[in-house]
């Protein structure tokens, strides 16, 4: 199990407190769909995904992005027991959604870039390291129930 | 980077980083002929340095984090898509001569 130091937890929670979950979620999911277009395969019923601006402005993308990022908020408050916290979502993504775990890593990477984009110089190497560690741990937790 | 030792010397780090960025500059100027332009570097990485191919995505990620945090508003989704595609293409060329 991944262990987070007190310092890492402080870095993660203090940045998270300043994150606009609704906007950041939509931004991250939108960027995933634009930068890695094959990920659009999971969102056939989302309507217009024909261009970057269509994707970034798509209300379903924004809504789903908010949902995904809210789950990540769960991760921030359960850093010591991510496997349990994400057990249900792991089963969902494997058994019903059939999402390859590689996509969790892609989204995690996109989110780190979105955070860097928002926070600028405040997103120091230490902050990046802490968040990258959390994203990797969440990806592992989400893949845990795969069979 | 064994030649940098356990304690990273800032000057060496910056110097090495600069060399890498200059190589990215070469790639930018030869986007349609990456294989030819980066051939010597592909030889170096594949036969001499033998950098683990898994490291390229890590560096690409760090590079984009840097672009995002420095450029902020300018780092639009289109810019991210273009740079991700470009850097991935560079990494493919640099790891093509591994075997």
Swiss-Prot record, chain A:
<dbReference type="InterPro" id="IPR012292">
    <property type="entry name" value="Globin/Proto"/>
</dbReference>
<dbReference type="InterPro" id="IPR000971">
    <property type="entry name" value="Globin"/>
</dbReference>
<dbReference type="GO" id="GO:0046872">
    <property type="term" value="F:metal ion binding"/>
</dbReference>
<dbReference type="GO" id="GO:0031721">
    <property type="term" value="F:hemoglobin alpha binding"/>
</dbReference>
<keyword id="KW-0479">Metal-binding</keyword>
<dbReference type="GO" id="GO:0031720">
    <property type="term" value="F:haptoglobin binding"/>
</dbReference>
<dbReference type="GO" id="GO:0005344">
    <property type="term" value="F:oxygen carrier activity"/>
</dbReference>
<dbReference type="GO" id="GO:0072562">
    <property type="term" value="C:blood microparticle"/>
</dbReference>
<comment type="similarity">
    <text>Belongs to the globin family.</text>
</comment>
<keyword id="KW-0561">Oxygen transport</keyword>
<dbReference type="GO" id="GO:0042744">
    <property type="term" value="P:hydrogen peroxide catabolic process"/>
</dbReference>
<dbReference type="InterPro" id="IPR002337">
    <property type="entry name" value="Hemoglobin_b"/>
</dbReference>
<dbReference type="GO" id="GO:0020037">
    <property type="term" value="F:heme binding"/>
</dbReference>
<dbReference type="InterPro" id="IPR050056">
    <property type="entry name" value="Hemoglobin_oxygen_transport"/>
</dbReference>
<feature type="domain" description="Globin">
    <location>
        <begin position="3"/>
        <end position="147"/>
    </location>
</feature>
<keyword id="KW-0813">Transport</keyword>
<dbReference type="GO" id="GO:0005833">
    <property type="term" value="C:hemoglobin complex"/>
</dbReference>
<comment type="subunit">
    <text>Heterotetramer of two alpha chains and two gamma chains in fetal hemoglobin (Hb F).</text>
</comment>
<dbReference type="GO" id="GO:0031838">
    <property type="term" value="C:haptoglobin-hemoglobin complex"/>
</dbReference>
<dbReference type="GO" id="GO:0004601">
    <property type="term" value="F:peroxidase activity"/>
</dbReference>
<dbReference type="InterPro" id="IPR009050">
    <property type="entry name" value="Globin-like_sf"/>
</dbReference>
<dbReference type="GO" id="GO:0043177">
    <property type="term" value="F:organic acid binding"/>
</dbReference>
<feature type="binding site" description="proximal binding residue">
    <location>
        <position position="93"/>
    </location>
    <ligand>
        <name>heme b</name>
    </ligand>
</feature>
<keyword id="KW-0349">Heme</keyword>
<comment type="function">
    <text>Gamma chains make up the fetal hemoglobin F, in combination with alpha chains.</text>
</comment>
<dbReference type="Pfam" id="PF00042">
    <property type="entry name" value="Globin"/>
</dbReference>
<protein>
    <recommendedName>
        <fullName>Hemoglobin subunit gamma</fullName>
    </recommendedName>
</protein>
<dbReference type="GO" id="GO:0019825">
    <property type="term" value="F:oxygen binding"/>
</dbReference>
<feature type="binding site" description="distal binding residue">
    <location>
        <position position="64"/>
    </location>
    <ligand>
        <name>heme b</name>
    </ligand>
</feature>
<keyword id="KW-0408">Iron</keyword>
